[in-house]
Every structure is written in C-alpha cells, then in structure tokens.
C-alpha cells in the first residue's frame, strides 16, 4: 500500500513580518504622520492664499528668482523651481536610502515577499496611466504627456489620513502600504529620468559621476563629516541639474551609494546599524517636515476662479483623467494585480485579513500628491493652464480617494483593533510582543 503524501500547505500572502521589520516601519510611519499633517497645512495655506484678495503676492513669491549663474551654470531659479528641483532632492535622497535598505535588509530582499508589492506597484502604475491616456488622447496637442501624473502614491498624505480616522491598521497592511509606496517612488524616479528629460548635456552628466563617486567612496569608508559629504552632494546635484536630467534623480543616486550594513572591517552587522539608517534618521525629519511641505506650498497654490473656474477645471479631460486615474485606476490596478498574483501562485490571503482590507489600502495608494504635482510641472510647465488643471485634478482625486478609503477602513476598524491588541500584547513585558515570539519559536 502506498502512502499518499500530505498536501502542501498553501503559502500565505500579506502575512505578519518579523518584529524588527514591523517596529522599523511603525517608526517610519509615525514620522510620516507628522510630516503629513504639516504637508496638509502647507497645501491649505497655499490654496487659501492663491484664492484670496492677496493672490498676486503668492504668485509673485512663487515666481521670485533667486540665485546666480556662476561658470555658466543655470542656477538663477524661481523659488518654486528651487523647491521642486532642490528641496525635493532631499526627499528623493531619503527615498534612495529607503530603497537601498528595503532591497538589502527589508522585505524586498526576499524575492517571495518582494514579488507581491512590486507587481502591485506596477499594476497600480499601468492602469491609471492607461485611463489617463484614454481620456486625454482625443484632445491631442500633447495632452497625453502627463500620463504618469496619476501613478504616484504620497505615503505622508496616506498615513495622515490613517491618523485622522484613528484606524489600527494591521502590521501586514502597514508594511504592504509602505513597501508599495517605496516601489512607487522607484518607478516615479525612473519615469522622470526617462520620459521627462528633453535634452541631455553629456559633459555635465559625465562630470556628475565624479562627485557622486567621491561621495560613495567616503560613505563606504564610514566618513560621516557633513563638511565633506554636503559639498559633494551639492556638486552632484548641480551637475545633474545642468545635464538636463531632473536634479531629484541625484538624490536617489546618492542614497543608493550609502551602505546599509556595516562592513567586516567595521565590525559587521552585529556591531550596529549601517550608515544608511544613520542618514535616514537624520534626514527624514528634514524631508517630511520641511522639504515636502515647502514644495507643496509652492506647488499646490492654484487660482480656481470661483464656481465657474472650478467647473471649467473639473470638466477638462486632463483633470478628469487624473481624478479617474487616482480614484479608479490606482486602486483597481493594485487590487487586481494582488488578486491575480495570489491566485496564480495558489496562495491564500492571511487569515487576519479580507480582500476588502486590501482594497482599502489600494484606495489609500490612490492619494497621489507630491510626486504627482512634480510630474505635472514637468509635463506641462509650472504655471501653465494645464498645470493648473493638474493641481485641481490631483487635489480632487486625492481627496476623493482619501474619503472613500477612510469610510472603508473605518468600517473595519473594530476588526483592526482586535488584530492590533493581539499584535501588541506583551505579557512577559520583554519589549517584544508575544505573537512575534511565537513566530520565532
């Protein structure tokens, strides 16, 4: 008699990760919550000011030129451009550090765990882009150039929504949302570098490699002196800006050079965190609390022109394409990709979750703000009529996506609270919740 082998247990997707990873992500989201609140205030101030009797002073401030052109470098820029090209480089530097850490020591280092958020991010990029192109293609005259606008996720805005509705989102969903946003940022940087670069100065681009390589050499040798690293970083940014490639790409490349783990010569991973964590700890408050809100202040201000102006903006195909892309395309792309990949790999959703939870998180990912506004500026030009339509579309689409997500997640909050109580219970008071200890056992 032959023994029938026992059926293999199905793999579970969106399951709870390790305690160290969960604690790290919780810390990041706490900081992003504060940054999200500042971001919302800055955007609200810009909108009110731009539609007040003093609107001219807002636009005069945004368009005020500051800088010089030493050695022929084009650095005499408006304050709005300094915010978009300069301050956002700090944001993308943190993105680079985050990406490097995820690929080296986070969820993305494991192909099995990385496949789902990476595929979901791609799905969440393709579907809204297709919707935008379908809506704007009949217009012609370069309207489809903004196809990438509704493809981005603003994690600070998303976690601010979570804070407002006081939901206890399970650790697995928080991890999925953050990882999704990180991959989204990687895709956004790639899109900006490839599709929104018109002319390239190869000499400046080649020269930018020199300070970038010196920066990499310093951080690999664990040199932390900002007196040395800051000039090298600024030089990389200036030359990248001069090359025609969007200068925020320099931030990501600088972040990629920073080591996540300590080298053997420095004591190895057991000796403590690598330089990437140290830099991220220092730079994230600057990014979330200053760089992104200041950019939002200069980018979100749009003169709506009363009810008639709002009606005109909302009826424009560019505005409609963005709203539909964010509210419909983004969540549907993420949800369907996740559902299909789960079915194809014959996996099961974690027992603590339901598919409605995944759709709620996918709706949060439809909140596209910072990067969406940046791509709008690049696609149509800062201050143009179409750029104003982009702002109305991004603000409206993000607000609608946030409201629907808030309602959906709030309905499930009783269940989330039960999961949260289980995930935070620490009966032996050793600082590690019991569920994570049982995972190790």
UniProtKB/Swiss-Prot annotation:
Gene Ontology CC annotations of this record:
plasma membrane
| Catalysed transformations (reactions) | Na(+)(in) + 2 H(+)(out) = Na(+)(out) + 2 H(+)(in)
Signal peptide (from-to): none
> Can you cite a GO biological process for this protein?
regulation of pH
Record bears the keyword Transmembrane: yes
Q: Which residues form a coiled coil?
A: none
Q: Which InterPro entries match?
A: Na/H_antiporter_dom_sf, NhaA
Transmembrane stretches in the record are: 34-54, 77-97, 115-135, 146-166, 176-196, 199-219, 225-245, 249-269, 290-310, 317-337, 355-375, 389-409
User: Which key words tag this protein in UniProt?
Assistant: Antiport, Cell membrane, Ion transport, Membrane, Sodium, Sodium transport, Transmembrane, Transmembrane helix, Transport
Cross-referenced Pfam families? Na_H_antiport_1
* Subcellular locations according to the entry: Cell membrane
Molecular function via GO? sodium:proton antiporter activity
What is its membrane topology?
Multi-pass membrane protein
Q: Does the keyword Transmembrane apply?
A: yes
Query: Where is the major localization of this protein?
Result: membrane
PANTHER family linked to this entry? NA(+)_H(+) ANTIPORTER NHAA, SODIUM ION/PROTON ANTIPORTER NHAA-RELATED
> What task does this protein carry out?
Na(+)/H(+) antiporter that extrudes sodium in exchange for external protons.
* Family membership noted in the UniProt record: Belongs to the NhaA Na(+)/H(+) (TC 2.A.33) antiporter family.
UniProt cross-references to HAMAP family, sorted A to Z: NhaA (MF_01844)
- Could you tell me what this protein is called? Na(+)/H(+) antiporter NhaA 2
Organism, by scientific name, is Mycobacterium sp. (strain MCS)
Gene for this chain: nhaA2
């Amino acid at each position: 008699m032959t023994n029938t082998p026992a059926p293999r247990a199905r793999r579970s997707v969106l399951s709870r990760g390790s305690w160290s990873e969960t604690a790290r992500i919780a810390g990041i989201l706490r900081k992003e919550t504060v940054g999200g609140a500042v971001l919302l205030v800055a955007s609200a101030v810009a909108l009110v000011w731009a539609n007040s009797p003093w609107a001219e002073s807002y636009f005069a401030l945004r368009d005020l030129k500051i800088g010089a052109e030493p050695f022929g470098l084009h650095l005499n820029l408006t304050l709005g451009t300094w915010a978009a090209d300069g301050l956002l480089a700090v944001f993308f530097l943190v993105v680079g550090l985050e990406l490097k850490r995820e690929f080296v020591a986070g969820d993305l280092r494991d192909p099995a765990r990385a496949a789902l958020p990476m595929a979901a991010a791609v799905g969440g990029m393709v579907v809204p882009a297709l919707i935008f192109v379908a809506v704007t293609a009949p217009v012609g005259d370069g309207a489809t150039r903004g196809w990438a606008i509704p493809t981005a996720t603003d994690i600070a805005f998303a976690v601010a929504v979570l804070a407002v509705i006081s939901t206890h989102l399970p650790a697995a969903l928080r991890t999925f949302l953050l990882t999704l946003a990180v991959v989204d940022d990687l895709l956004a940087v790639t899109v900006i570098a490839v599709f929104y670069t018109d002319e390239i100065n190869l000499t400046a681009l080649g020269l930018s490699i020199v300070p970038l390589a010196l920066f990499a050499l310093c951080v690999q040798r664990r040199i932390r002196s900002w007196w040395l690293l800051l000039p090298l970083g600024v030089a990389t940014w200036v030359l990248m800006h001069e090359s025609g490639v969007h200068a925020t790409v320099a931030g990501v490349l600088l972040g990629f050079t920073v080591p996540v783990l300590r080298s053997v010569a420095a004591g190895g991973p057991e000796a403590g965190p690598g330089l990437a964590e140290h830099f991220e700890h220092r730079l994230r408050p600057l990014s979330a609390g200053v760089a992104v809100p200041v950019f939002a202040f200069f980018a979100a201000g749009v003169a709506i022109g009363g009810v008639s102006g709002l009606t005109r903006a909302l009826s424009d195909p560019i505005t409609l394409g963005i709203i539909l892309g964010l509210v419909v395309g983004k969540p549907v792309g993420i949800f369907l990709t996740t559902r299909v990949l789960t079915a194809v790999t014959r996996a099961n959703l974690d027992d603590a979750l339901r598919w409605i939870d995944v759709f709620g998180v996918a709706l949060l990912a439809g909140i596209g703000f910072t990067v969406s506004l940046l791509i709008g500026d690049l696609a149509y030009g800062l201050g143009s009529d179409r750029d104003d339509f982009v702002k109305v579309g991004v603000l409206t689409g993000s607000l609608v996506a946030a409201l629907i997500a808030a309602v959906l997640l709030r309905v499930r909050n009783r269940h989330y609270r039960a999961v949260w109580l289980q995930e935070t219970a620490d009966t032996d008071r050793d600082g590690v919740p019991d569920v994570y200890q049982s995972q190790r056992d």
